[in-house]
């Protein structure tokens, strides 16, 4: 994954100027907020060029492409299954909508991974990545060459989707409490947990399909309580 970065990391840290760290961090912020096709294309070219200059290899980019491909395959499967079980039919228009949503998520995730790789290569001490090393020790994995890349991927995914998950959690937990407060039996607790998980997944998929909804401030409506 990040093996080509590890090979040159020690030499890079000694000669990387502060402007490289600032530039890599600025690229990371730009990748988080890129929305247009032109911005995506220009950032992709810049990141590919910088990755080739810094690492003399594109192995890490190939690893990022594999990760994004696996995630998009999982994303499309969930979207199609959700559409089929909701409406019973999967039309060409719905498939095109899923492809459009998958493009935006996939390209932003790819840019985010590439930018985080460069930021990691140009930065010597960072609390985020020291936390990743601690995670590896907790998992009892001796080789940090395997632990750190996996932890970084998990961190980037959490940062990418963490805001939506946290917002939905704070809203839907009141629904979960309302359903369990009426009856404290084990069956009712399991039913409320499954309903909460299903509603959370549905709302996250809806936000992924409509990027404009990510900035909206939603409130849980009362009809969710009486949906079943």
UniProtKB/Swiss-Prot annotation:
Query: What's a Pfam family in this record?
Result: CbiQ
Q: Where in the cell is it found?
A: Cell membrane
Which keywords belong to this entry? Answer: Cell membrane, Membrane, Transmembrane, Transmembrane helix
Major place of residence: membrane
TM annotation in the entry: 37-54, 67-89, 104-126, 138-160
Name-wise, this protein is Uncharacterized protein TP_0226
Question: Keyword Isomerase, does the record have it?
Answer: no
Membrane topology type: Multi-pass membrane protein
The record lists the lineage as: Bacteria, Pseudomonadati, Spirochaetota, Spirochaetia, Spirochaetales
Question: Where does this protein come from, organism-wise?
Answer: Treponema pallidum (strain Nichols)
The GO cellular component terms are: plasma membrane
């Amino acid at each position: 994954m990040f093996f080509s970065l590890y090979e040159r990391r020690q030499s890079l840290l000694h000669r990387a100027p502060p402007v490289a760290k600032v530039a890599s961090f600025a690229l990371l912020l730009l990748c988080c907020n890129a929305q247009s096709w032109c911005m995506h294309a220009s950032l992709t070219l810049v990141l590919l060029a910088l990755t080739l200059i810094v690492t003399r290899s594109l192995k890490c980019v190939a690893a990022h492409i594999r990760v994004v491909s696996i995630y998009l395959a999982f994303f499309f499967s969930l979207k199609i299954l959700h559409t089929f079980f909701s409406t019973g039919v999967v039309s060409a228009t719905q498939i095109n909508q899923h492809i459009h949503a998958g493009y935006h998520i996939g390209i932003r995730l790819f840019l985010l991974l590439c930018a985080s790789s460069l930021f990691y290569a140009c930065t010597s001490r960072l609390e985020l990545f020291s936390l990743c090393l601690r995670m590896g020790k907790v998992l009892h994995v001796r080789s940090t060459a395997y632990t750190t890349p996996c932890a970084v991927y998990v961190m980037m995914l959490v940062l990418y989707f963490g805001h939506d998950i946290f917002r939905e959690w704070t809203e839907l937990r009141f629904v979960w409490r309302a359903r369990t407060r009426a009856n404290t039996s084990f069956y009712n607790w399991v039913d409320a947990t499954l309903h909460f998980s299903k509603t959370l997944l549905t709302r996250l998929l809806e936000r992924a399909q409509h990027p404009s909804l990510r900035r909206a401030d939603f409130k849980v409506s009362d009809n969710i309580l009486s949906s079943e």
